[in-house]
């Protein structure tokens, strides 16, 4: 059936800020779908509050709204734009829930707008726990014994009937939010009360725990005609009980017999037909490893994290096809974009193995619980492809960029046999390393399987890797042994460690004997048809399929790897824009990246895509085959920057700013020389390697000092130290990972923090806009609320900023991007740090100023000038509206993590508020970040002594807004003495009713708690207050500047005269 011609204008709902459970995969899906709709001549409107995405670029849709994803703002956009249809299945859980709410409240019928791609009834049947249960029972699909409960008493009664442990799954939530496994009544009460609060409809499913069964997923497609195909089936290495987003996943499944595979495939198609789903859908199963018994765990009636993985694993563009099906096309009418010969009704075939490993944030949150359950904790993931499972696992491990490159990287040799056995039972992110250690000690496969419930097939494969370690350690390195080690992807540096042979000699031995990587293509059809836009993966001991092309010029663009705190989707945005710019100028583009969730790894972004780890050895193999004319490293974050030196050694030209100038910005002594030459002041400080040296520097310049390693992103390992003991502690933590570069110790200055992104052509600079942070220095720039245009700095300070930016860019010979952070102390400007590369603020500042910085920087790298491109050098004219970028955190998913803000970054995402007034923009930014206020108008204040004078002003503003203020002893006394009617409440250690009772009583909206120094202690009152506030869903602020900003925003909300102004990116 050709497409439905009644559909002319579609509103696509994006997924909002990146949080744990909802990452870059929706930017990828949304971008692909918008492009797919525009191909069909549809007018596309898009709403998304996340400015870091490609989907919010003006060329992706006809109208782009960066507005909070709330019912109110969507209604306004629908009234203004009058779309005939809404596509809600590409915006993750956020998009689905909004589509549902718009349909339920009758607004869509009123406006004559219909949901396409799915119906409200389908969403309800799949997402509502009771409706889903009834539907499965109706078609005879087995589910675990369960009951939907709306209160705690019913939950306890049902659990007593079926016995512990039980799994709790809230309805309509994302990434397992609020869910978990309860082993006893206390755990049940804790998890259930949280789950009922987080569910949109106040429902939680309590079900029999089938942890230990295999977890299998099927990604299926269906059109309106009832044609169905399975795109891919996947198997979690971890058994049921770990969220699939936190599991190691392999595609296609490796341990299913044909009977099991066909049984689950039939079931998946049965379910998708009953639910009448049109488009992509994901079905998760639990399979009893000892029989043919299975249960349906859940169905996602939308594009999901798993569908991004399935798309990249097979080359089948699920989001693109879903968008076409939503327009009425059938599968056999949609061409396969990779082969251009087959159709979307053709099931993909894989002649390789794909492994996905989650990227978990425990390197950022040293106090957080490492255990993995049904509530997701990963911020991102990596994917690798190989022709054998062991090789794919080894490649995925080194793609994580967590200082791991083999199964020896986490060291469990110090454990006794009993301790090791206990560790095997712990489900955390290091489990395969523990299994490897058990195998080294001769523990039997069956015994490991009994404890971990991981299939024997996977244990056997880990044993093959352990056996190879042993052979490399004990045997002579022959050509045959080296061939076999490379076949299962042992990197040269690991072979070198095990054999005690120099890495350079191993490489020479490989080259002399022709042991080099060959590249195979992903073509969806196991090489049955010719592929037009393939992508490649490396294997050893096979024929090379990467086509020899000799165009005029080739550029290698290094991607940014997995999404993690500190290096998010912003850098993918920069990589993609850079690639598009080079392609426009006739260069052949080559991307290397390993993140399945991103736009950069889509099959049609670059001319060639290599799905490989971003390490020197892996990149060198590609360079040897492609021989690029140059490489661009300034857009891939720290990942790409770290490979600069290796690329130069390979003889690859670095395009843009030269490597030695990048080093000069990171190297303390060289940078100090540049500052002296250019006459720019900075904080006093020095470089050290040991705690003794650090204490000496700190005492010379005076406490407090900022301690940080060099060459890091997102303030990794950065701390503010107030005394000698803290220096000892912090240097100890930094030095747990061997440092190749010195540690920096600087005087900590208090002032306004200002950030500038600029481009330089070697002579002139262009600054699109100056951004000012609401939080004072000491809070990482990625965690601060950022305001454009800067609104409290003087003209004189602005002139100084522009002048200093120009001097620094010229002294560092910048060609392309530069990012500088300054401090403004009473019009005296100091430089904090300089990064001659793109930064996380680039997408945001590009959008709000309308200056496409990445494109301009790429053109400069190719030889154009700022004037030649038609721009006036210096600071661009400022806008007549305010744009505020608000950080978004995922603390509630990370039990035990310290939430107070400091110099190490903790936010996972961001959203944007745009308005004519400062307060209006602030209100939208808080709304976009999901801050729901006020409900009860009751708050708790407990602030450190230094903040008390400022707390009085804040408290008075909240009092005026009608808030009842509770405060702990000394804060209450101080507030009362200064005319605030604060109610004193006991500390946690004192008798009830105390602070904890108030928080756990669910009657508090807001906690303002500014921590004292030495915030590492988990038993202190402050830590417990902050943690419990977050875990019961209370908004918690840890800096006075943020509290002031929130008061501003709420004053706007209460003053209803200001209409919400809806602006599109086009008009900015």
Curated annotation (Swiss-Prot):
Positions of Mg(2+) 1 binding: 284, 298
Domain MGS-like, residue spans: 931-1068
Binding site for Mg(2+) 2: 298, 300
Residues where Mn(2+) 2 binds: 298, 300
Binding site for Mn(2+) 1: 284, 298
Subunit relationships: Composed of two chains; the small (or glutamine) chain promotes the hydrolysis of glutamine to ammonia, which is used by the large (or ammonia) chain to synthesize carbamoyl phosphate. Tetramer of heterodimers (alpha,beta)4.
Family as reported in the entry's similarity comment: Belongs to the CarB family.
Name of the molecule in the record: Carbamoyl phosphate synthase large chain
Organism: Agathobacter rectalis (strain ATCC 33656 / DSM 3377 / JCM 17463 / KCTC 5835 / VPI 0990)
Highest classification ranks of the organism: Bacteria, Bacillati, Bacillota, Clostridia, Lachnospirales
